């Protein structure tokens, strides 16, 4: 805690004060000195110039020139150095620091090529969203995070008893395995390993020799004789291109050498092994040994300091690592004085590079061969520094102790270091090391979780079974530890203090572990090139080895990146496209932009799902804070540790199944394998290499996920590849501790850094001339911020010069004196320094990590303030304007300007504190805020959603005002005649109202408008974009938006003309002048009364708790009393009244008020010119009129109060201050909006800190509560300022102390974050099969919020207009809460008939705090009977005193308790309970077989399959007598047709059970097929059913009778993962449609039938019933895996029903669920939240997590506070501040898409609709006259008002809202499809869901061109009941029309595209088209549950004329899902 506070003070507070400079102990001395000197120069230089030289512009010019030169030089060098690193031209250079003796020792190798090294690329985030850390879902460890789980067991003596260990560890679990027991036993013995046979040098290994078994044998060299030091391949690394580390490697890879080496790693723990691994106290040091501890700088993803911006050197201080010296060796002390530039490392995930430890932890593998008969000793040394084993000048070693005859051996990795570029391209297919296609084992390293290869001990040439040997002087099977040398020298070594276990290599087959003394510290290793260990191992790395990193690390990191575990992507986008056969390692925590949970690990080592289940149980335990080892570690320990047990022995015979018996066998590929019985074997078979085998044959495919084990395809390589063979490791002293959630991925994926090669880069300073520069990118990034472009550099130099010029200009002007001169120079220096090294993260930065925009904030603001000071001073001096008095304030006087100048001057001097407190936003946010405020408060605009939209909106308003200004000026410049209004003024009024109406209807986002323009002007671009978009399933949303905007534009074209003409007529009359004394007050009173009734009284009566006194709404919707909503909400009378009053208010009352004020003011100005000139008065009138009218059109709920306050204040209270009603109204509207903000802020603050309901989330909250009392006065001042500037008031760290944040626009979140889906369309196939990406509840459930967003898009605007959410305004926030969906809805832009909103979905089952708050908003308070401390009860329907008091002290209120919205009801059943017993599984398998037979018989390719020769030949043996498929996956318990006699599946037994079903299915075919028992059809069905069941058994490992493997296999088949492993099934590859169209849908359909079996077990006994059920399900239901894009497409297309099998792998669960979705209408509670509460809490979260770097996942600011919904609101922030599972894009809802509102208002008007209405009216009149003349005959029903118009075109019956009677029967049936959100092709031929059309019906006669609608024979589809269907079925102009009874384009306003809907023609009797009882039963709900209201007044609600198409039954097979056939034919 203390170190974190110091870090915040140093990197946050101090850096903010200085502009970015602070002392960073983690950086090099050069870097700190450079920063200090630059900052001092920028501070002192202007100060000295001002103090020493006389003030003149010449000095200012010199100052600017010097600053420009310095900045240009620094920026140029920085830019060119980055370009140098990008080019990657490396100059090889000899190690200059190598000592003479070391050079002699390396003489033999000096000619080898040096490691050129590869420069690091700068990594940046793959996405803009850092990972989630705060969610309840993210306390997950991955398999490779074992390092963070392993404890340290530091024993105080050489011998410790197990009981002592357990007692010492307390409650922590210690896993003590047989290997540990061996270590404890052996630790008491100290015996030196005797002299071992020497190995002659020069023996070269034979590359053809095999690698040995990973658990049984060791790598061999040559004929079993270990080699000395001889040549090795010297393939250098190719240079980097464009700075990417993942570029192509050279033609040939570096050859690894020396397979017989032990692993040597330096240890970072202060511990040492004594003897054979006995535990030794590590703290016994000499008195002179220092013991520095870790520096405590724990960086997480929330710390975005300079260390995170690639400028950190060492995150830990030096530790003393004590290791044993080799026997006989003297270890001289050496200093750890490594050049800091070699240790410069980043620690920032967000800066784009891995963290400090990530790059610092490469393993170095050294060692030498061991004689055949000896078990080689283990050298375990672990460095934790990048400068690992670097050469340095140290005392020469004593070589006399080396055994004679030995020469120094070469290192394991020589020459050009093997893949030193540890960072590989994120998306590359091949990481460098993995390109060798090697199989690897990964040790769980402590802080790095990296792989370490453990080469095997050497073995004799004989390839027989391994014998356990003891070293010299030891008995067989006993390990003899060496003695510890007496005079071990201990030297300090830099190390990490995070290691919790040592990873030791051990002999897999033998039960003994031989350990040599550990190598000494780094100094000893580096200083003794000639020293040899007891086993003949050199303890020194020659120079080449120092440069050679471990070969495994780069590939490990590359794979993790490739799997998405490492959050970085290289700067350059070039990536290799290679194929690799390497099985990818487990990714730790997959990062989804969705913010969903990390993907759990797949089953490792080819394990069956049981281990996967175990893995997830381990995760669940870790989540519940139980100290349990994660399953992956359990698995590794059981597999690896137990093999060291003494019971492992070779099997005595074939039947030996005793514990530890090892059997050998050959698999089908000829690979020799071993299998060990019992725990020692771990249940897995291991490959055993033999003499002469290829190395590839010995590799074990550890990561195979198929049911059969197979070898990896490792290509033939040299013996060096043996290093990469798997090798078990021992995890010593394992103990689990809890992993803090804030550990970033980059810190859990640490890799030990290799020793960096000393190389230089070519720096081209002139064309053709270069010099060598020895530097690296990380050091440069630590030194200076990177600027990527030339223009950015030029802009930075220019900005720094401008800062210097303007600052010095103010100094020359004399604005500052005394100490303020120095303060101003400090401000100048901070602004300039931020252009070189900015504050990261800044207090105003909305994101973690490096924010490049922030770097420009200070200088830009400084320039603006300086210009403002200079301008105000000039204006005050010149006084160009005469002073004006407005509302008692004198404006434009000299004192006014000077006062403003002084305020700006003081503000500029306070810049360091302003930026420390974060009171100024970053530049782009400030620009957007200013433009939005000007547009909203000056011109009545709507909110902006981005800086671009703000610019567009303000430009549009300025153009409109400029156009109107000319008319207004011309009208008031000429004198007016008495009692007359000039025509020009009337024209101005007409244009003003019309343009205000049009602007209020347009969105501020021009994207859709531009797409319309582009489609008209540039159709080729549109076609190109469409072709690109066809790759994914089509999204109907963009086209629907374009259609809606097109309708609005066409409607406005008509309505604006009408409005302008009417307004002109009214204004031209003299009504406003003649009645100006009376009319104004009448209009004010009318507006006030209507507004009060509409916006106060009605909403209060409709609230859940009216006035917080009544317990029920007075005006209840029809659904209020329903327990379960059955249909769409009914339109109530008070909703119609509310909408009608709003219409009258918007379009009649307020335009009249504004026109009256305009006319009166203009008349007054013309008659009596006032203090304003005419030009100013015309401008004021234009702007005020535009603003007031647009505000009235957009947001009428707030207008009546503004008008009332204006009248009261300026007509009665202060009439002398009035400047005319129009200007008064304009000013009061601005003032009222600020007062509303202030009111909301005060309510939030008082509610939050009310002492009787304070909820302290932490101890800090309790501590800060008393300090809030003296803070109250300051708090009120802050509230006033924040209300004035629209800034949030945020609680500091969630406490009761509030501080003001920076100004934000209405869209107050600055990052455009929205959730990206994770499904099979955007993930790799291998991850789909192995890891099932996104298989967690959050990712899978996010689709329901996406569907909810689409539903709201159709209905939200209309529902708001109908008053169903109460009063609303821009910026309001609502919470929608139902049983499982909890979403936060932000209203951003509120226009006239449009709403732009964003929805944020929370977790279904969230944290404890979230559940408490959900309970608070969903539970009722009606039952509360308390009054103070007693319970007297309450009056009927009235709240008790306590409940009423409590509801008033909440920051939220329930506005509707029954808001009906279309969505999906989700039912999930646990699949385990439904398949627990064998009988239930047998039912499923039987339905599986029947479904396969059904799909075979229905397939159109059946004839092709039956005639296929290959298929017939493969199935011919099936018909032989006595044939049975005896696969072990078949059993009597699950296969109904199992043949006991033949012990398998035979054709006769199959026919005995399924022949009747086959014959029935064949009989339903149109073409007859042979159906005999031995016919090709039956044989094909038999073959496919056997294949399908074998695939299920193979996937589920059905040898086991347990349920989990069965579910695993069922889920694998359900998602399409078919593994055809048997040669007998390969005939299916003759046509893949056999799998795609038969077997795959069969397993899905079987699951649905199995579900139905529980409701009616005997329903499907008859073949006809089963056949019809499958056919109905096939057409009505979409059955798909949730990862399939078809699933998302089906949901977004509003499919009625869906089914899926979900495998949930969350941290707390691992189970299979059957998910059933049914589309229906859901009931939500609508809770309106105080918008300032949301703004304040979000601002507080941002400040706490980004700037204050609070990493605590259980921080107090997210604990539940029911009065403010603190947890729910904070959870909905953008990730990583919050953790919503879905964030929608900004979505616009239009009123025209609401069907009920359109029915109420008639819809938009267009020219085409008007023309059609006129023609129809004429035709109707003509027919009526003709019928009247023909002896009084009746007119056709179709022409009597019920048949034409909109209703005839509607694709729905006119029945608007079903009554309970006619809707009662529909509860059992799935609802008909709702809004037509996408193309919904039908599966049938007609496609419209009706019987074949009656062709004799005459189509309606339509004059004019034919309608652009479906053909006359194509009738309405019941699957499209919503409004948008009307948009698609229209006339040539494609527009709506008004309702028929309203005159314009009534129901007859549209051409009929099918038969008239009003009734059948007279010539036709009503037809009963019911096909069958089933059909009619299906049709009934389709008819009675339509959403559309009755559109024609002549038809009573709830009824339809007989024979209307609405009465037509819907055949069952036609009621199809919207996704249609493409959704049912999935691709696998």
Swiss-Prot record:
Q: Where is the composition biased (Basic and acidic residues)?
A: 263-273, 305-319
Look up the record and report any one GO term of the cellular component aspect: membrane
Organism name: Mus musculus
Q: Which family does it belong to?
A: Belongs to the pecanex family.
Bias kind Polar residues: ranges? 427-437, 488-497, 1978-1987
Q: Which residues carry this modification: Phosphothreonine?
A: 129, 370
The cross-references to Pfam families, in alphabetical order and at most eight, read: Pecanex_C
- Taking the first listed entry, what is the main subcellular location of this protein, grouped into a coarse class? membrane
Q: Which residues cross the membrane?
A: 33-53, 54-74, 793-815, 819-836, 852-872, 880-900, 903-923, 946-968, 980-1000, 1053-1073, 1078-1098, 1244-1264, 1280-1300
Residue ranges for the region (Disordered) are 96-116, 193-239, 263-625, 1845-2028
UniProt protein name: Pecanex-like protein 3
Q: Where is the composition biased (Low complexity)?
A: 444-459, 1966-1977
Positions annotated as glycosylated = 95, 319, 1770
- Tell me the keywords, alphabetical order: Glycoprotein, Membrane, Phosphoprotein, Transmembrane, Transmembrane helix
Give the range the annotation lists for the signal sequence: none
Q: How does it sit in the membrane?
A: Multi-pass membrane protein
Q: Show the taxonomic lineage.
A: Eukaryota, Metazoa, Chordata, Craniata, Vertebrata
């Amino acid at each position: 805690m203390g170190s974190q506070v110091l870090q915040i003070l140093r990197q946050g507070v101090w850096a903010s004060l200085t502009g970015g400079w602070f002392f960073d102990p983690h950086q090099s001395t050069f870097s700190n000195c450079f920063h200090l000197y630059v900052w001092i120069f920028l501070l002192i230089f202007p100060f000295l110039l001002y103090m020493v030289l006389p003030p003149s512009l010449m000095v200012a010019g010199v100052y600017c020139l010097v600053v420009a030169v310095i900045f240009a030089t620094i920026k140029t060098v920085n830019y060119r150095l980055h370009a140098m690193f990008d080019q990657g031209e490396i100059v090889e250079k000899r190690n200059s620091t190598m000592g003479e003796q070391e050079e002699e020792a390396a003489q033999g190798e000096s000619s080898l090529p040096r490691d050129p090294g590869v420069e690091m690329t700068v990594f940046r985030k793959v996405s803009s969203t850092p990972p989630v850390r705060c969610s309840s879902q993210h306390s997950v460890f991955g398999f490779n995070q074992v390092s963070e789980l392993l404890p340290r067991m530091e024993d105080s003596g050489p011998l410790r008893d197990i009981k002592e260990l357990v007692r010492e560890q307390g409650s922590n679990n210690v896993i003590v395995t047989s290997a540990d027991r061996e270590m404890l036993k052996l630790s008491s013995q100290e015996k030196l390993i005797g002299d071992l046979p020497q190995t002659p040098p020069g023996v070269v290994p034979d590359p053809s020799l095999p690698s040995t078994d990973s658990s049984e044998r060791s790598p061999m060299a040559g004929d079993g004789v270990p080699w000395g030091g001889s040549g090795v391949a010297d393939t250098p690394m190719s240079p980097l291109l464009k700075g990417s580390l993942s570029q192509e490697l050279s033609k040939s890879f570096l050859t690894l050498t020396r397979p017989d080496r032990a692993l040597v790693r330096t240890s970072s723990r202060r511990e040492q092994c004594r003897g054979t691994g006995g535990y030794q106290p590590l703290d016994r040091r000499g008195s002179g040994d220092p013991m520095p501890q870790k520096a405590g700088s724990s960086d997480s993803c929330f710390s975005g300091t300079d260390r995170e911006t690639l400028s950190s050197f060492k995150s830990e201080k030096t530790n003393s690592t004590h290791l044993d010296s080799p026997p006989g060796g003297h270890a001289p002390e050496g200093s750890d004085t490594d050049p800091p530039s070699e240790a410069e490392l980043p620690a920032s995930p967000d800066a784009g590079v891995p963290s400090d430890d990530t790059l610092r932890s490469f393993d170095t593998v050294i060692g030498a061969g061991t004689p055949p008969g000896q078990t080689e000793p283990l050298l375990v040394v672990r460095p934790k520094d990048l400068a690992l084993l670097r050469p340095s000048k140290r005392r020469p070693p004593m070589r006399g102790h080396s055994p004679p005859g030995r020469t120094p051996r070469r290192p394991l990795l020589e020459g050009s270091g093997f893949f030193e570029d540890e960072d590989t391209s994120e998306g590359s297919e091949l990481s460098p090391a993995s390109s060798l296609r090697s199989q690897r084992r990964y040790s769980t390293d402590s802080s790095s979780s990296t792989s370490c290869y453990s080469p095997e001990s050497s073995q004799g040439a004989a390839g027989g079974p391994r014998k356990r040997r003891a070293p010299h002087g030891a008995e067989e099977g006993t390990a003899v530890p060496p003695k510890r040398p007496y005079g071990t020298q201990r030297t300090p070594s830099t190390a990490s203090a995070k290691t919790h276990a040592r990873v030791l290599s051990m002999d897999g087959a033998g039960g003994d572990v031989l350990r040599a003394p550990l190598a000494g510290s780094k100094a000893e290793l580096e200083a003794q090139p000639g020293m040899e260990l007891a086993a003949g191992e050199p303890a020194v790395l020659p120079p080449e080895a120092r440069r050679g990193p471990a070969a495994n690390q780069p590939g490990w990191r590359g794979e993790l990146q490739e799997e998405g575990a490492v959050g970085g992507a290289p700067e350059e986008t070039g990536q290799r496209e290679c194929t690799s056969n390497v099985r990818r390692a487990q990714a730790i925590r997959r990062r989804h932009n969705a913010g969903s949970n990390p993907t759990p690990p797949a089953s490792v080592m080819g394990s069956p799902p049981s281990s996967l289940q175990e893995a997830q149980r381990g995760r669940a335990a870790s989540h519940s804070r139980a100290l349990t080892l994660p399953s992956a570690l359990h698995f590794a320990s059981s597999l690896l540790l137990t093999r060291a047990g003494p019971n492992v022995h070779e099997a005595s015979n074939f039947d030996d199944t005793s514990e530890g018996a090892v059997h050998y066998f050959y698999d089908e590929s000829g690979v020799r394998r071993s299998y060990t019985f019992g725990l020692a074997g771990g249940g897995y078979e291991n490959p055993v290499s033999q003499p002469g085998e290829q190395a590839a044959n010995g590799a074990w495919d550890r990561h195979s996920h198929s049911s059969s084990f197979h070898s990896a395809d490792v290509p033939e390589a040299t013996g060096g590849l043996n290093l990469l063979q798997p090798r078990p490791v021992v995890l010593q002293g394992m103990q689990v501790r809890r992993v803090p959630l804030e550990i970033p991925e980059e810190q859990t994926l640490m890799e030990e850094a290799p020793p960096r090669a000393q190389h230089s880069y070519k720096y081209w300073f002139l064309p053709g001339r270069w010099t060598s520069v020895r530097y690296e990118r990380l050091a440069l990034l630590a030194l200076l911020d990177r600027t990527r472009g030339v223009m950015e550099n030029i802009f930075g130099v220019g900005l720094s010069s401008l800062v210097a010029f303007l600052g010095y200009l103010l100094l020359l002007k004399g604005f500052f004196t005394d100490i303020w001169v120095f303060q101003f120079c400090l401000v100048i220096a901070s602004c300039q320094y931020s252009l070189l090294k900015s504050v990261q993260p800044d207090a105003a930065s909305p994101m973690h990590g490096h924010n490049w925009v922030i770097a420009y904030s200070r200088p830009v603001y400084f320039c603006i303030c300086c210009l403002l000071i200079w301008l105000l001073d000039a204006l005050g001096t010149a006084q160009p304007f005469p002073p004006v008095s407005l509302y008692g304030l004198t404006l434009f006087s000299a004192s006014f300007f000077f006062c403003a100048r002084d305020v700006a001057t003081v503000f500029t001097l306070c810049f360091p504190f302003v930026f420390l407190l974060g009171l100024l936003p970053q530049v782009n946010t400030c620009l957007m805020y200013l433009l939005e405020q000007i547009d909203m408060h000056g011109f009545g605009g709507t909110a902006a959603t981005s800086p671009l939209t703000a610019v567009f909106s303000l430009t549009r308003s300025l153009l409109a005002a400029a156009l109107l200004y000319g008319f207004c000026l011309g009208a008031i410049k000429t004198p007016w005649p008495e009692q007359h209004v000039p025509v020009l003024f009337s024209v101005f009024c007409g244009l003003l109202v019309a343009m205000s109406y049009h602007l209020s209807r347009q969105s501020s986002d021009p994207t859709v408008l531009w797409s319309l323009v582009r489609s008209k002007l540039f159709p080729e671009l549109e076609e190109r974009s469409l072709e690109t978009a066809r790759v994914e399933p089509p999204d109907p949303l963009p086209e629907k938006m374009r259609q809606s905007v097109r309708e609005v534009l066409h409607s406005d074209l008509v309505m604006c003309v009408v409005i302008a003409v009417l307004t002109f007529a009214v204004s031209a009359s003299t009504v406003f002048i003649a009645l100006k004394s009376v009319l104004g007050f009448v209009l004010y009173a009318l507006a006030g009364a209507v507004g009060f009734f509409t916006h106060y009284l009605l909403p209060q009566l409709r609230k859940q708790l009216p006035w917080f006194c009544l317990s029920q709404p007075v005006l209840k919707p029809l659904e209020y009393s329903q327990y379960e909503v059955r249909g769409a909400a009914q339109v109530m009378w008070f909703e119609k009244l509310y909408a009608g009053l709003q219409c009258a208010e918007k379009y009649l009352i307020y335009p009249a008020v504004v026109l009256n004020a305009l006319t009166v003011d203009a008349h007054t100005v013309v008659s009596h010119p006032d203090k304003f000139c005419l030009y100013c008065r015309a401008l004021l009138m234009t702007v005020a009129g535009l603003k007031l009218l647009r505000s009235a059109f957009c947001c009428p709920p707030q207008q009546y109060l503004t008008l009332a306050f204006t009248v009261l204040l300026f007509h009665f209270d202060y009439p002398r201050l009035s400047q005319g009603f129009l200007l008064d109204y304009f000013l009061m509207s601005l003032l009222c909006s600020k007062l509303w903000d202030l009111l909301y802020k005060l309510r939030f603050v008082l509610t939050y800190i009310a002492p009787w309901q304070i909820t302290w989330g932490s101890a800090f909250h309790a501590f800060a509560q008393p300090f809030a009392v003296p803070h109250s006065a300051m708090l009120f001042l802050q509230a006033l300022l924040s209300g004035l500037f629209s800034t949030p008031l945020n609680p500091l760290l969630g406490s009761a102390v509030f501080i003001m944040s920076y100004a934000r626009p209405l869209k107050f979140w600055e990052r455009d974050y929205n959730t990206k889906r994770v499904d099979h369309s955007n993930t790799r196939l291998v991850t789909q099969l192995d890891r099932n990406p996104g298989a967690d509840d959050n990712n899978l459930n996010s689709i329901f919020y996406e569907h909810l967003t689409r539903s709201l898009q159709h209905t939200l605007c209309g529902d708001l207009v109908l008053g169903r959410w109460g009063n609303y305004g821009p910026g309001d926030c609502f919470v929608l809460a139902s049983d499982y969906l909890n979403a936060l809805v932000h209203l951003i832009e509120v226009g006239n008939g449009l709403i732009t909103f964003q929805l944020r979905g929370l977790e279904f089952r969230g944290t404890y705090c979230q559940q408490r708050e959900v309970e608070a908003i969903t539970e009722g308070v009606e039952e509360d009977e308390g009054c103070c401390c007693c319970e007297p009860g309450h009056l009927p329907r009235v709240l008790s005193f306590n409940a009423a008091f409590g509801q008033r002290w909440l920051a939220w209120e329930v506005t509707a308790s029954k808001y009906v919205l279309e969505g999906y009801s989700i039912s999930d059943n646990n699949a385990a309970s439904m398949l627990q017993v064998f009988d239930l599984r047998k039912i499923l398998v039987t339905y599986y077989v029947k479904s396969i037979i059904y799909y075979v018989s229905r397939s159109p390719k059946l004839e092709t399959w039956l005639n296929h020769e290959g298929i017939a030949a493969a199935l011919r043996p099936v018909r032989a007598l006595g044939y049975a498929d005896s696969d072990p996956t078949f059993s009597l318990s699950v296969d109904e047709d199992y043949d006991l006699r033949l012990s398998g599946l035979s054709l006769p037994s199959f026919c005995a059970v399924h022949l009747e079903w086959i014959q029935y299915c064949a009989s339903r075919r149109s073409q007859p097929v042979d159906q005999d028992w031995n016919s090709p059809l039956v044989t094909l069905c038999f073959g496919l059913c056997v294949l399908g069941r074998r695939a299920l058994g193979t996937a589920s490992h059905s040898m086991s009778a347990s349920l989990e493997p069965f579910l695993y296999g069922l889920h694998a088949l359900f998602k399409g993962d078919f593994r055809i492993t048997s040669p007998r099934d390969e005939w299916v590859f003759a046509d893949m449609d056999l799998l795609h169209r038969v077997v795959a849908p069969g397993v899905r359909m079987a699951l649905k039938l199995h579900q139905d079996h529980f409701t009616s077990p005997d329903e499907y006994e008859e073949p006809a019933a089963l056949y019809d059920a499958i056919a109905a399900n096939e057409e009505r239901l979409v059955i798909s895996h949730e990862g399939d894009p078809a699933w998302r497409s089906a949901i977004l297309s509003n499919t009625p029903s869906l089914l899926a099998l979900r495998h949930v792998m969350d941290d707390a669960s691992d189970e299979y669920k059957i998910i059933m979705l049914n589309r229906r209408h859901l009931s939500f509670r609508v809770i309106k939240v105080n918008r300032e509460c949301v703004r304040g809490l979000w601002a507080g979260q941002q400040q706490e997590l980004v700037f204050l770097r609070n990493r605590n996942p259980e921080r107090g600011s997210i604990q539940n506070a029911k009065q403010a919904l603190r947890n729910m609101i904070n959870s909905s922030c953008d990730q990583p501040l919050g953790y919503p599972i879905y964030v929608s894009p900004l979505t616009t809802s239009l009123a025209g898409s609401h069907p009920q509102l359109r029915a109420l208002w008639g819809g938009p008007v267009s020219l085409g609709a008007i023309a059609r209405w006129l023609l129809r009216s004429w035709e109707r009149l003509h027919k009526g006259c003709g019928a009247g003349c023909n002896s009084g005959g009746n007119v056709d029903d179709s022409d009597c008002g019920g048949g034409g118009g909109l209703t005839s075109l509607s694709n729905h019956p006119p029945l608007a809202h079903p009554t309970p009677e006619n809707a009662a029967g529909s509860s059992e049936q799935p609802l008909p499809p709702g809004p037509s959100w996408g193309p919904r092709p039908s599966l049938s031929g007609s496609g419209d869901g009706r019987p074949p059309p009656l062709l004799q019906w005459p189509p309606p006669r339509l004059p004019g061109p034919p309608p652009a609608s479906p053909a006359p024979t194509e009738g309405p589809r019941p699957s499209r009941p919503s409004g948008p269907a009307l948009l698609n079925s229209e006339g040539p102009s494609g527009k709506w029309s008004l309702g028929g009874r309203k005159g314009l384009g009534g129901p007859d306003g549209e051409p009929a595209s099918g038969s008239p809907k009003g009734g059948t023609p007279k010539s036709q009797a009503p037809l009963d088209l019911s096909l069958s009882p089933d059909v009619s039963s299906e049709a009934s709900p389709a008819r009675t549950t339509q959403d559309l209201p009755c559109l024609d007044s002549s038809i009573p609600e709830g009824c339809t004329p007989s024979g209307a198409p609405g009465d037509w039954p819907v055949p069952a097979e036609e009621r199809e899902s919207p996704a249609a056939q493409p959704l049912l034919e999935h691709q696998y």
